Amino acid sequence: MSNASDHVDVLIIGAGPAGLTTANSFNGSNCRVRLIDWKPAPLETGRADGLKSISLEVLDSFGIGDRVLNDCQPCEEIVLWNPGKDGVIARTMTIPDKVEELGQIERVMVENLYRHKTVQVNWNTQPVRLHIAPVTKDEPEAHPLTITVQNKETLGQETIRAKYVVGADGAHSWLRKYLNIGFSGDVTDSTWGVMNLVPKTDFPDIRKVFVVHSRAGTVMGVPREDKLVRLYISMDGGNRHTSIDAKSITAENLLQAARAILAPYRLDAARIPWWSAYCVGQRVADEFARHNRIFLAGDAVHTHSPKAGQGMNTSIQDGYNIGWKLRYCLEQKASPALLSTYQTERRPIAQALIDFDRKYLESFTRRDITHQEFLEAYLAGQRFTTGIQIQYPPSLIVTAKHLHAPSHPLATNLAPGKRLPDFQMVNQSDAVPIQAYHRFTSDGRFRLLVFPGDISQALAFGRFSRLGDWLTSHLPPSSGLEIITIHGARRADVELMDLHPAFRPWSDEEGWNYWTVYADDDSYHKGHGHVYERCGISKEDGVLVLLRPDGYISLIASFDETHELIDFFDGLQSGPRTVPQPERRANL
């Protein structure tokens, strides 16, 4: 008979970006979570590049955004080199760029797990068997998944019983193969090498993001921390249809290929901490979930060329998506139908990623590409990897009202299914400015953002106070909903204690909460956030925005449509009243 200590709510397999993001989503919860990985320790130097703003916002919500940034190498421009008529490469284009190149993100995320002590982390551990017991939807406390894991050093085995399993175990996922889930797609005829090196070179743009097309092939360079540069090197000698066995490639082969492409500039390596070679695979898993109990994320469900940071950023979003949903189901006893939205939301994104990657890879391998074509491909890549164009389809957690309109009439720059943009707001109590995603910590809660307008005006203040009465009677603190007010008045014209207590809740242990009311106003040292303007909200009408724990918008309503909040949370507990829509392609 298993011990209680062998029972967990969630077992996460794999400590890469997807698995670590999923694990960090449980920090501060009472959930029993274990994370296992076959590696002996977290990677000291990450193997992914290009942290985008949307991923930084996720890390901000974990409280580690600033720490990750401290380890990053900021990049401000990308340069393109092409051969001239004489065949000699020359700089032909410079594009402003803004991206943070990663250093030790995985180490920082693991340290955050250790600090919170919510998730148990086991290294040198891999799964060897899985048994799935039959279970009905009426057994939320069941542990139907029995996983046998093995320590790689001692060969000792342990049996774990779990409610849910998340497989974030990479492109060669043990869990995906064990479940016999198809991995549709193909391996291209494009062979590339990748290496981290400390370069000794006279190439003038070595500390910028650069792409060099020459008659000998293509190389992309990305500056990193500690004097390192990441090079992506085409290994086909400029012939895109040459088949090369990646397993036969050595580090010296990579260096020789890079030298040929960068000629007449010289290139040597002071040291090479890491390198690899691969044939580009572009695949998407046929299923992202099985039985609503087992979920796959990250490279376990999508593989592609690693040249735009899209893989790591997409993997972080996968982990963030399934992490909050599992936590919400476990803590709030929500309908299991919530978990079904993971596949309907994330698989279309993965397919769009592969479709995009095919075009993006073409822009890096074509030597005859024009400046305009490369610029268009690059800008398309920026739009994709930032995630700002993603709009999730209607579901249990995205209301269909106004979904297909370009925006909501009361918030013309917001829409259900899209992510709330980050912005600066000023704390009403202490005048300290803060970015939204620094404040919106990852704690598994929905947030009702109340934009009451200019509450220094009697009409807006009265409407705001009536909303407070309604919230007190219909959505008490026990609902688990956090209410955040962002008003449009001058901060000096508002007194916190004049506001309805629903917006500054009282705790017998800690007194008033001074971190729930903010002003869209000038700060003393960091300017004005212009929140209402950026979101397209009228200070006369105001609006209510229901925000999911992952920062995407569930619902937008007027102050006269508060019943929609009741309907939303009723549905979240009982499940959808209609047949779910079939999966569709992502709206990007």
UniProtKB/Swiss-Prot annotation:
Induction: Expression is positively regulated by the fumisoquins biosynthesis specific transcription factor fsqA. Its EC number is 1.14.13.-. FAD binds at residues 9-39, 45-50, 232, 289-299, 309-313. Disruption phenotype: Leads to complete abolishment of isoquinoline alkaloid production but accumulates a series of benzyl pyrroles, including fumipyrrole. Its cofactor is FAD. Substrate binds at D49, Y232. SUPFAM superfamilies: FAD-linked reductases, C-terminal domain, FAD/NAD(P)-binding domain, Thioredoxin-like. The keyword Cell inner membrane does not apply. GO terms for molecular function: FAD binding; oxidoreductase activity; oxidoreductase activity, acting on paired donors, with incorporation or reduction of molecular oxygen, NAD(P)H as one donor, and incorporation of one atom of oxygen. It holds the Pfam family Phe_hydrox_dim. InterPro entries: FAD-bd, FAD/NAD-bd_sf, Phe_hydrox_C_dim_dom, PHOX_C_sf, RIFMO-like, Thioredoxin-like_sf. Keywords: FAD, Flavoprotein, Monooxygenase, Oxidoreductase. Pathway: Secondary metabolite biosynthesis. Phenol 2-monooxygenase; part of the gene cluster that mediates the biosynthesis of the isoquinoline alkaloids fumisoquin A, fumisoquin B and fumisoquin C; as well as small amounts of fumipyrrole as a shunt metabolite. The products of the cluster lead to a brown coloration and are important for growth and conidiation. The nonribosomal peptide synthetase-like protein fsqF, which lacks a canonical condensation domain, is required for addition of a serine-derived dehydroalanine moiety to activated tyrosine but is not essential for the subsequent steps leading to isoquinoline formation. PANTHER family: PHENOL 2-MONOOXYGENASE FSQG, TRK SYSTEM POTASSIUM UPTAKE PROTEIN. Homodimer. Belongs to the PheA/TfdB FAD monooxygenase family. This is Phenol 2-monooxygenase fsqG. It comes from Aspergillus fumigatus (strain ATCC MYA-4609 / CBS 101355 / FGSC A1100 / Af293). The gene is fsqG.
